[in-house]
């Protein structure tokens, strides 16, 4: 065992004692970030190249700082995104919704589909769609100035073809010039009710921006209600919406769409763990 792998083993034990959910993966990712290699390349780092900053990173993770804030990067589908304090860290669960969105775009008989991402955060969803559906034109909306800076940086670095346009605006008022023309609206809005505050992991509630977590209203679904109204305004007849929610809110979000006139094919869809994760709906064509 080389020095770095030995130190990773020690760090894993420390992070496990601190209550980290995935201590080995965290230790490896911290080591990879410090040494600027992939996790699969850690075994090749020579003893002479060991960087003692690794232990500074481990101490920060022990104290509850999010892994992605320490490393400054988050992985989402095929992207490596720049993240940090003030922007929501994208989660793997959201990747399933993006996969559905891409399949839906492929099935549309539209040459250059128009997509809107409401509450883009780091621009993970917007960039994934733009890069994996190269003909898509994507408008990403973010109201928080700090998150907007992160999104701008990621778009400038990754969107070489200029398919994503970023807008600093609120969900409700966004993009009136596109009313009735959009093919697909996607959103991972805030949806946690404040009554769940004590159950949210500290490294989430103390570090992710509040506006990206707490959805408003007793059920946490007020932001999703705004997304539904905005999607109904933006979409063309026959266009689709996809909105993420927690695994306990599927029924509530289903009825937000099903009870409104104009929506068809409302469905709750599951993530890779077979839990309710996002609702999709089609705006009626008549």
For each predicted feature, which ranges?
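Conserved AdoMet
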Residues: 29-104
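Residue-level signal for inorganic ion chemistry
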Residues: 30, 64, 94, 125, ...
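Conserved SAM/SAH cofactor-binding pocket of Class I
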Residues: 96-199, 226, 258
């Amino acid at each position: 065992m080389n020095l770095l792998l030995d130190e990773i083993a020690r760090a894993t034990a420390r992070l496990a004692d601190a209550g980290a959910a995935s201590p080995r993966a965290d230790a490896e990712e911290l080591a990879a970030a410090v040494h600027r290699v992939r996790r699969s390349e850690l075994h090749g780092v020579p003893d002479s190249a060991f960087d003692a900053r690794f232990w500074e990173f481990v101490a920060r993770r022990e104290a509850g700082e999010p892994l992605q804030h320490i490393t400054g990067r988050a992985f989402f589908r095929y992207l490596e995104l720049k993240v940090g304090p003030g922007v929501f860290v994208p989660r793997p669960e959201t990747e399933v919704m993006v996969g559905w969105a891409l399949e839906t775009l492929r099935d549309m008989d539209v040459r250059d589909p128009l997509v809107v991402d409401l509450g883009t955060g780091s621009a993970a969803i917007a960039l994934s769609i733009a890069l994996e559906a190269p003909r898509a034109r994507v408008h990403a909306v973010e109201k928080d100035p700090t998150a907007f800076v992160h999104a701008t940086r990621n778009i400038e670095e990754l969107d070489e073809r200029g398919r994503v346009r970023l807008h600093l605006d609120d969900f409700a008022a966004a993009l009136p010039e596109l009313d009735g023309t959009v093919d697909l609206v996607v959103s991972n809005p805030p949806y946690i009710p404040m009554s769940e505050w004590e159950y949210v992991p500290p490294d989430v509630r103390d570090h992710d921006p509040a506006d990206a977590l707490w959805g408003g209203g007793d059920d946490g679904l007020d932001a999703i209600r705004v997304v539904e109204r905005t999607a109904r305004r933006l979409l063309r007849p026959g266009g689709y919406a996809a909105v993420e929610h927690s695994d306990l809110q599927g029924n509530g979000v289903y009825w937000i769409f099903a009870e409104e006139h104009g929506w068809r094919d409302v469905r709750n869809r599951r993530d890779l763990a077979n839990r309710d994760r996002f609702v999709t709906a089609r705006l009626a064509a008549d």
